């Protein structure tokens, strides 16, 4: 299995840029994070599943009300790993075939179009692991695969202090992954603290639609 990395093309102007990406897998919305992003005007890319969209209309309305801050991208239909062979990853059964990968990607895309009118450009599968052939399938469907370079919250399982430390340590060009669908987990508090620390350092926050992510890449 492949776990692709993603970083921004550096701009040599002495400024530090990072991209915050947040996965909304299923379940609820962590308003500690969402409300802070709005209040502090921190741009972020939110990867949503069709399952999450179905139950989080209020949070979606907040995202849609701030197009200057939030880019909405594709996290799949049912949070099934986009892997075209029958394996289990972190206890989650993978899609298992090319047809099932297409369904996961397209189901997510169609849900985003229906809910927002926007066409997603990026796809991140559940667990962020793929095969080289499933990545080729995703590209063939017109989507780029969104890797990352800093794992902020360890799948939302880390404590607040460790999550904050990971995020605050991000360097120029890093793409951070964390979660925005676990309001009861300590990690969410760490996401907030880590992002505020980056902001205090004068870091510029980018989204995946930034020109720094122009192809070539995934």
Language-model segment annotations:
Residues 119, 129-169, 202-214:
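His/Asp/Glu-enriched short active-site or ligand-binding loop at hydrolase and phosphoryl-transfer sites
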Residues 82-89, 157-161, 186-192, 217-218:
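Histidine/acidic-residue-rich catalytic or RNA/ligand-binding cores of hydrolases
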Residues 2-12, 40, 54, 185-218:
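C-terminal domain-boundary segment and adjacent tail
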Residues 95-103, 167, 185-189:
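Non-membrane alpha-helical structural segments and their capping/turn regions in soluble enzymes
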Residues 18-21, 44-48, 71-74, 121-124, ...:
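Structural recognition of the beta-strand scaffold that forms the well-ordered cores
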Residues 1-84, 89-90, 96, 107-114, ...:
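Active-site beta->alpha N-cap acidic-glycine motif
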Residues 4, 34, 60-61, 102-109, ...:
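Generic structural signal for well-ordered alpha-helices
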Residues 24-29, 48-58, 124-131, 153-159, ...:
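Acidic-and-aromatic substrate-binding clefts and catalytic sites of carbohydrate-active enzymes
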């Amino acid at each position: 299995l492949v776990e692709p990395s993603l970083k921004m093309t550096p701009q040599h102007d002495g400024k530090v840029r990072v991209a915050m990406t947040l996965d909304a897998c299923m379940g609820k919305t962590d308003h500690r994070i969402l409300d802070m992003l709005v209040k502090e005007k921190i741009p972020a890319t939110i990867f949503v599943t069709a399952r999450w969209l179905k139950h989080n209309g209020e949070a979606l309305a907040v995202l849609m009300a701030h197009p200057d801050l939030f880019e909405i991208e594709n996290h799949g239909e049912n949070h099934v790993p986009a892997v075209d062979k029958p394996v289990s990853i972190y206890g989650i059964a993978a899609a298992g075939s090319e047809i099932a990968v297409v369904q996961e990607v397209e189901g997510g895309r169609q849900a985003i179009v229906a809910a927002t009118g926007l066409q997603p450009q990026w796809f991140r599968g559940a667990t962020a692991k793929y095969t080289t052939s499933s990545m080729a399938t995703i590209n063939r469907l017109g989507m780029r695969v969104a890797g990352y370079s800093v794992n902020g919250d360890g799948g939302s399982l880390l404590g607040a202090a460790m999550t904050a430390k990971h995020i605050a340590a991000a360097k120029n060009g890093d793409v951070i992954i964390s979660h925005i669908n676990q309001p009861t987990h300590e990690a969410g508090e760490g996401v907030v603290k880590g992002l505020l620390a980056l902001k205090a350092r004068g870091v510029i926050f980018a989204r995946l639609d930034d020109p720094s992510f122009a192809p070539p890449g995934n």
